[in-house]
């Protein structure tokens, strides 16, 4: 076997796929990777509701879930049983609403509880295939939900999607802030611009009296953003109804106090993007 010829062939395919990705990304104005240093901070819930919120403002939005081992976007949006259609060899994202399309690994599984037992090269290949073989069309925003940490999936997005920016999600506790600091250093090392930081689970809204109680220490996200000279996009409180909505596949209710906080995050995010 001619190993050199084989390697050259693989390099050519890789380069062709990279060009294909860049050509497709030219049709998308803003690309945003939603990242967190650790799991359990509500990153996917933030990603889903940012996408929904932008779509309700009239923007054309795509939501791509590249959390290969723990995809949850389809569950949050209530489309676990939605099958991804194919146009020849291209994936057609699920039309969640008039302005929002969704693509998740979860929609490609035969059974929702099937585990995905893959090593790095397979995951990298699938993320690149999601980016190269999906029919998004023209979008204002592509929101990319990445798994927590600084592993293969966020690294692949950072190195592959030109013009991508990171939206970092943390909670107020120091254990989460320590990990989001690692994410900040990751972004700096791979030259991924940081759009801003969101502090999630910032206080608890009592379902009875509707007042905000700081069950964790608060303000850590804002201080971290200031320490690293990045934009602080806002705080999102805990509302038990948001958990119920997510488990039942619904977005944040219009009358939830979280909705107003989310809208402020969106406005800050849009302002940041327009200022770049």
Mark where each language-model region is:
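C-terminal lobe/tail of nucleotide-utilizing enzymes
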Residues: 1-19, 186-276
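Glycine-rich phosphate-binding loops of nucleotide-dependent enzymes
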Residues: 103, 127, 146, 159, ...
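Residue-level signature of catalytic and energy-coupling elements of molecular machines
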Residues: 28, 39, 65, 73, ...
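Phosphate-binding loop that captures ATP/GTP phosphates
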Residues: 60-62, 66-110, 117, 124, ...
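Conserved Switch II/interswitch segment of TRAFAC-class P-loop GTPases
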Residues: 137-144, 150, 162-183
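Extreme N-terminal, non-catalytic leader segments
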Residues: 1-41, 82
């Amino acid at each position: 076997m001619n190993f050199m010829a084989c390697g050259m062939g693989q390099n050519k395919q890789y380069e062709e796929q990279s060009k294909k990705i860049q050509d497709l990304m030219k049709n998308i104005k803003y690309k945003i990777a939603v990242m967190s240093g650790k799991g359990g901070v509500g990153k996917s819930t933030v990603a889903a509701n940012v996408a929904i919120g932008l779509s309700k403002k009239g923007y054309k939005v795509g939501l791509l879930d590249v959390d290969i081992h723990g995809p949850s976007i389809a569950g949050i949006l209530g489309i676990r049983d939605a099958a991804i259609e194919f146009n020849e060899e291209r994936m057609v994202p699920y039309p969640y609403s008039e302005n929002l399309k969704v693509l998740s690994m979860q929609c490609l599984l035969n059974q929702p509880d099937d585990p995905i037992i893959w090593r790095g090269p397979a995951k990298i290949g699938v993320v690149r295939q999601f980016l190269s073989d999906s029919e998004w069309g023209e979008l204002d925003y592509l929101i990319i939900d990445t798994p927590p940490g600084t592993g293969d999936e966020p690294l692949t997005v950072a190195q592959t999607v030109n013009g991508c920016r990171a939206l970092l999600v943390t909670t107020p506790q120091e254990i989460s802030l320590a990990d989001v600091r690692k994410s900040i250093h990751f972004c700096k090392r791979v030259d991924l611009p940081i759009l801003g930081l969101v502090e999630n689970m910032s206080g608890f809204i009592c379902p009875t009296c509707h007042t905000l109680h700081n069950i964790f220490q608060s303000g850590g996200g804002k201080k971290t953003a200031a320490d690293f000279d990045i934009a602080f996009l806002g705080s999102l409180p805990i509302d038990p109804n948001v958990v119920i909505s997510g488990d039942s596949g619904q977005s944040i209710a219009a009358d939830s106090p979280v909705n107003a906080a989310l809208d402020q995050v969106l406005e800050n995010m849009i302002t940041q993007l327009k200022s770049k």
